[in-house]
């Protein structure tokens, strides 16, 4: 059997630091695949010997998209090491910022990173705008910005891009390919929401900045709490935040969820065939408290799609595997004992990866020796299986409308659907989280920082900050 190797370097949709090599057979089926992180970060090396209170500001430079979560996890790891408990208001403000990032990231991930794998922009140019407006009502009684006139304006804008030869980021699509399933009218509806999502994500950045100071790379976290005191006590700032979240919720309910229902319907056969299904190991660490005793996400571990058996999450079972990574130590180690000593072995003479040895700068995390899937799909499945009073009602509603079963979410389309459902949940529960803050302020609880004397803290300590974040589970371990 003859094989062909394809190399894609860089994968531009994830900031350009990933290389993929695949081998395909004569039927164009992928038989082997290797992923290689091509950038040495070295954040651990940079942090060694520094004041632990600075760890968050430095660690968040790992990524310009998900900066807040690295900032928070690093700060929380230091707090855990020193046994510092932050005030409830500080936890609320941290949750407001992080959950806003969840919603923004999910909208960007679907519309601006993934949707054009399903949506043919050139097909939208032949759409009947009146029919498009009517088709949108199949999935939502009152679709988002759905007038004939507005859709005509969107169509004219797209036509202008094409006629002027200024497709820009749309220039390299496989437009017209037979695997696109949407009608011209459905493509136009999607492109309408694609462009609207650009505005929504900009507004969500403003919401994050209200409490975080700025984004990316916010500045509001310190060991022991937050610095957003003036913003927390300013009614106008609170109203500005809520206004953006209300507008975002409207977009999710009248655009994002209906668009996912449309995609599920169009690609139902690929769902039933299990396209994109992985090994079925799901892991969640849980978290995000609101109200008295409730939390947004459940913790749990499911293996092999066995939804009848769910284990509690145990962070001590996490290890980092480096046998294929460009580091000296090959053994799987606890993150507390992890080593980041580079050992670069280069590529083959023809420029391909040395797939029999080391070929990436990225370590491979394992849970009890197993590969695990984390992120929206894992959280929605674990929450559903554990009968979460938060997650299960949203999942059941989407499953009823989409005619999906739980196993159907463990597919490429299903992951996108899970992300949309989670965006809706996070957006709704931002209001509950804000209510907790307002309730505390009403009863004169304005505490945002736990006082401590740094010089009196232990000279040796270790701690971990492990969180659910938009695209998975994030752990920062400090010693």
PLM segments and residue spans:
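A translation/RNA-centric and nucleic-acid-associated enzymatic feature enriched
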Residues: 476-478
